[in-house]
């Protein structure tokens, strides 16, 4: 729905990401991430990572969102080796087109 390259470019602008749902805020905190980290995940996405588009709400408003799944190898220090981690990201652009509303950012469960 949203041109991925445009969304990725927008992540480089300060203040352009908004964790839009309470659950998203909790999931991002659980990962030990901040909005810069979420922006980094979005910049790693490719068109092949696209999953689907769906309507999402935050309890007050609705947004048309694109959902992606990002798979990457990450070194887990406690285990001393790399594991394949799968992230699920769902986002929309705000009405102005200058704000990315992050609806979901969590690992697969």
Regions found by a protein language model. Give the residues of each.
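Short, surface-exposed linear patches
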Residues: 41, 90-93, 109
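Short, solvent-exposed aromatic-acidic interface loops
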Residues: 102-109
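Short helix-capping/linker segments at secondary-structure and domain boundaries
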Residues: 35-36, 97-99
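Functional cores of ribonucleases/endoribonucleases
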Residues: 48-97
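Compact soluble domain cores
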Residues: 2-69
